């Protein structure tokens, strides 16, 4: 059974969820089955920086960068599904990775 797997990445979870919802609606309008959006683990990168430029090593500041991930599977896509996905306008700040899974002959 052919399947399109779409991975979404971004720093803002609200924008990411809105983008995933747009993809799900477009796929359902074309008649394909949709699984997701499935939230994947959030990657958290933490940075510790010394506040002062010269000394005062005990005074530090902590920053973190959260990368949120979502997964959407489109099962049995047709030509209309692919056309809908190609014309979809998604906001900036969302990275999209599209793969085809299964359906190999």
UniProtKB/Swiss-Prot annotation:
Name by which UniProt lists this protein: Small ribosomal subunit protein uS10
Question: PANTHER family this protein is in?
Answer: 30S RIBOSOMAL PROTEIN S10 FAMILY MEMBER
Pfam families named among the record's database cross-references: Ribosomal_S10 (PF00338)
Q: Which UniProt keywords apply?
A: Ribonucleoprotein, Ribosomal protein, RNA-binding, rRNA-binding
Region forming the signal peptide: none
One GO BP annotation here?
A: translation
Which Gene3D superfamilies has this protein been placed in? Ribosomal protein S10 domain
Q: Which SUPFAM superfamilies match?
A: Ribosomal protein S10
Task: Choose one Gene Ontology CC annotation of this protein and give it.
Answer: ribosome
Q: How does it assemble?
A: Part of the 30S ribosomal subunit. Forms a tight complex with proteins S3 and S14. Also contacts protein S9.
Question: HAMAP family annotated for this entry?
Answer: Ribosomal_uS10
Describe its function: Involved in the binding of tRNA to the ribosomes. Part of the top of the 30S subunit head.
Family the entry assigns: Belongs to the universal ribosomal protein uS10 family.
Q: Which residues form a coiled coil?
A: none
MF terms in GO: rRNA binding; structural constituent of ribosome; tRNA binding
Q: Which PROSITE patterns match?
A: RIBOSOMAL_S10 (PS00361)
